[in-house]
Amino acid sequence: MDKVRTVSDSKRDFYTKHTRPINSVYRRVVEELMVEMHLLSVNSDFQYDPVYALGVVTSFQRFMQGYRPDADKESIFNALCQSVGGDPQQYRQDAERMIESAKQLSAQQLLFNLESASDSSSGENQILQTLIGIANAPKYKYTRLFAIGIYTILAETDPEMLKNTEKREEVVKQIAKVLHLPEEKMQKDLDLYRSNLEKMDQLLTVIEEALQADRKKREQQKIMDN
């Protein structure tokens, strides 16, 4: 019987693959995402899909905004995926395909086709193919990262709708119902995601203001020294 990999195994693999130090604020983001992905990778009910991949890629991109040096982000993402047995290129490609497919749909078209929930209604749209497959599956392991993938798709199909709490929650409710997912948990996960994005944006603003103040101070000091 194969030994089940532990979180420590994944962390060790990660830091073997990405050897440069990670800023403390961002290290927490990376490690929390790694733990979440690890726990799913060893869960027998979990099955990778492109919407989940989009959630992973989006979470990484949004919460790693402002990371310096910027060139390190690719190495960090690669190590993150590989540490849980994933292929970073597959994650990126699947996420890109989901975004491209989302651009071909409106939120109304997405819901209409999902509610019909037949393979024939999906056409060649990969989002519909993926989601209708999930709707028709005998069981599906819901994840927070899948919910973020759905949110990212909705942001592409109808960004204005997401700004309206009532409309956003109604659409999420309908999607959860069609896909047989826990609606209340999905709503809470997305509320927390939105809240964390706002906090991250505020933190980035504070960091940028501090950097500007430091640059200004150095410039003034340089003038005085001359």
UniProtKB/Swiss-Prot annotation:
Keyword Transcription among record annotations: no
GO cellular component entries: plasma membrane-derived thylakoid photosystem II
Coiled-coil regions, chain positions: 183-213
GO biological process: photosystem II assembly
Keyword list, A-Z: Coiled coil
Database matches in InterPro entries: Thf1
Summary of the function given for this chain in its UniProt record: May be involved in photosynthetic membrane biogenesis.
Family: Belongs to the THF1 family.
Protein name (record): Protein Thf1
